[in-house]
Amino acid sequence: MARRPKGRFIDGIVLLDKSTGMSSNFALQRVKRFFNANKAGHTGALDPLATGMLPVCLGEGTKFSQHLLDADKRYLVTAKLGERTDTSDSDGEVVQTRAIDFTEAQLLTALDFFRGETQQVPSMYSALKYQGQPLYKYAREGIEVPRESRPITVFELNFIGLEGDELTLDIHCSKGTYIRTIIDDLGEMLGCGAHVIMLRRTQVAQYPYARMVTLEQLEALVAQAHEQQIDPSVLLDPLLLPMDTAVADFPEVNVPDAIAPYLMQGQAVRVPVNADLKTDELVRITLGDIRRFVGIGTMNEDGLLAPKRLIVIHDEPAETD
């Protein structure tokens, strides 16, 4: 008999406000431990330098983390002008220093270049892989490998301010956009070089900024629970967002209770649906009058709802540490 995983069967999403100086995986493991969750996964790593929104999916919520990886993001970034580094941020070594000499008109023209759909060549200091190895491993050995440009979209690029040699921007962009690369490219266009000294992710998909919580706040709640001699879950679980918020933009298809068992066994079922739904379009599946979320699926060519990823409903508690 397979050993059950340690931790609680707890499902949901924590909007972590990651602090600077820590890896996203370190932050993930701390959240998992605080919630005593059997399973956890984040939805797109932030560099150690970066702070801000890092949605952490717990339990069955991890099945939908890819859809947050694919979501739009928003960042507040401050760049130091006049210096270019090998990593395009302040964690790297300065490789070139140049005078800052551009006009306001030149800056605005350069910023406009990055708006809309463009192509971006990823930094060598990224987790993208080449022949099975992350690019940053090659970079640390002084090896540069070919990288193909990738399409990105910058929906908004707002000028916030320029104080001395520090430029601050607000950027709303598509998945896979490297803010460090935008800043490095901008610095080259301005002829002075630039690198990131502050990066904060302020939004992922439509998640509210105000719902973010820090590791310090989580730790304080655990300590408070111990003082009150109550289970930490009493104070922590209200912070969780429902896991279906990861696919909130998907159209809903509601399955009547009578045929729900067939769907939950993986069978395609016929249900009344919106005529506007396209074949193979991803949908959010709910059950019965209470509209309980159970996963995602697609409408196949026969007009049947085919489950693609369903949650597991646990009846027994998992083992604890």
Curated annotation (Swiss-Prot):
Q: Which reaction does it catalyse?
A: uridine(55) in tRNA = pseudouridine(55) in tRNA
The GO molecular function terms of this record are: RNA binding; tRNA pseudouridine(55) synthase activity
Q: What EC class does the entry list? A: isomerase
Which controlled-vocabulary keywords does the entry list?
Isomerase, tRNA processing
- Which residues are the active-site ones? 47 (nucleophile)
Which GO biological process annotations does it have?
mRNA pseudouridine synthesis; tRNA pseudouridine synthesis
Give the EC number(s) under which this enzyme is classified: 5.4.99.25
One Pfam entry for this protein is TruB-C_2
Stored HAMAP family: TruB_bact
Q: Per the similarity annotation, which family is this?
A: Belongs to the pseudouridine synthase TruB family. Type 1 subfamily.
Full protein name: tRNA pseudouridine synthase B
Species the sequence originates in? Shewanella baltica (strain OS223)
State the organism's lineage.
Bacteria, Pseudomonadati, Pseudomonadota, Gammaproteobacteria, Alteromonadales
Point out the gene that encodes the protein: truB
